[in-house]
């Protein structure tokens, strides 16, 4: 709702803006003033309900169809599962979703928790994407190996508890809570159920990313992908731009010293599926 108010005012000309103000009560005008003050401090507020806009307009990157499905699903659904092939950019898009979640909520009200099968995966797969994204944008704060802090506030962190340590997730809560499970195929049933218990109240979201099971059948991730509780978005190699012919846009994440190239360079291609 805040985003809609802001967008209507910011996109209007002075005459239209005056007409809008004329229809408002003094209390509503005060509310608009507070929103505009907030916008000055955080221009990303207009993307509260528009994660695609945040990524494409706010930070200037391209998205292809399946990526848009994922980010909109996190906006609209409490639980999203993405069983995907190798190298479709799962961790890349997860980092953008995390950035959107933190950027559009007031500091201190939102938190992101990430986990994976091992701490090595937490540290080396998803968090480098988060670190690079924060560094190249004006999202603010400092990102260490597995923590993102803004003005001293811990807004996101990664961890990997023991398979049977369901108590490790106790006490995790925030008005706006996003939990991201990378390499979800290896997560234990005990931890999976514990993470799902965090979805019981408030504005909470759970995003699972992983490869379809091969030798680890009947895993918690596989059950989630077969559950009506989840919005499931499968991504096969032939769903990605190098096979569909869809434009993936120009890569904006590599250093400026790297020659301009398509995002498709980083995605699964024919050499992977031969």
Role assignments for model-derived ranges:
Residues 1-274:
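Phosphate/NTP-binding elements of NTP-utilizing enzymes
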């Amino acid at each position: 709702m805040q985003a809609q108010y802001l967008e209507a005012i910011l996109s209007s000309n002075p005459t239209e803006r005056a007409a809008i103000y004329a229809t408002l009560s003094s209390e509503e005008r005060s509310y608009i003033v507070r929103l505009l003050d907030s916008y000055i401090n955080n221009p990303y507020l207009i993307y509260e309900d528009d994660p695609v806009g945040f990524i494409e307009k706010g930070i200037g990157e391209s998205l292809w169809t399946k990526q848009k499905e994922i980010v909109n699903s996190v906006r609209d659904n409490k639980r999203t599962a993405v069983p995907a092939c190798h190298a479709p950019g799962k961790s890349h898009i997860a980092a953008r979703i995390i950035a959107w979640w933190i950027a559009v909520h007031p500091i201190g009200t939102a938190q992101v928790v990430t986990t994976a099968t091992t701490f090595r995966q937490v540290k080396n797969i998803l968090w480098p994407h988060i670190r690079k994204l924060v560094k190249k944008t004006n999202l603010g704060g400092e990102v260490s190996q597995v923590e993102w802090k803004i003005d001293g506030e811990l807004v996101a962190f990664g961890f990997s508890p023991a398979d049977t340590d369901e108590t490790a997730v106790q006490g995790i809560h925030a008005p706006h809570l996003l939990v991201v499970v990378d390499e979800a195929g290896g997560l234990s049933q005990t931890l999976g159920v514990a993470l799902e218990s965090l979805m019981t109240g408030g504005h909470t979201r759970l995003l699972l990313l992983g490869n379809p099971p091969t030798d680890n059948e009947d895993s918690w991730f596989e059950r989630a992908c077969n559950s009506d509780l989840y919005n499931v978005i499968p991504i096969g190699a032939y769903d990605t731009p190098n096979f569909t012919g869809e434009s993936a846009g120009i890569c904006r994440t590599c250093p400026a010293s790297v020659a301009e190239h398509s995002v498709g360079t980083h995605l699964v291609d024919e050499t992977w599926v031969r």
